[in-house]
Amino acid sequence: MAFLKKSLFLVLFLGLVNLSICEEEKREEENKEEEDENEALSEVKRGFLEKLKTGAKDFASAFVNSIKGT
């Protein structure tokens, strides 16, 4: 009977360890996915800001040229 108890505890312990490892891997994978999404969003923002900056420069130079022409 004691042998069965020890075996059962061993099986339960190994199951809990395995479950813990799986949960940790799952969390790491989710964190990596979030980082990838944040990186992609950052690239989109960077591209938008570059276009906005270029547009502002073009607008300013056109505005200055229109003032000089009058």
From Swiss-Prot:
Residues 1-22 form the signal peptide. It comes from the Eukaryota. One of its GO terms (cellular component) is membrane. The modification Lysine amide is found at K68. Changing E50L: In frenatin 4.2a; important increase in activity against the Gram-positive bacterium S.aureus (gain of activity), the Gram-negative bacterium E.coli (4-fold) and the fungus C.albicans (16-fold), and gain of hemolytic activity. Expressed by the skin glands. Transmembrane segments: none annotated. The keyword Flavoprotein does not apply. Belongs to the frog skin active peptide (FSAP) family. Frenatin subfamily. Frenatin 4.1a is a mutant of frenatin 4.1, it has the same peptide length and is non-amidated. Frenatin 4.2a is a mutant of frenatin 4.2, it has the same peptide length and is amidated. This is Frenatin 4.1.
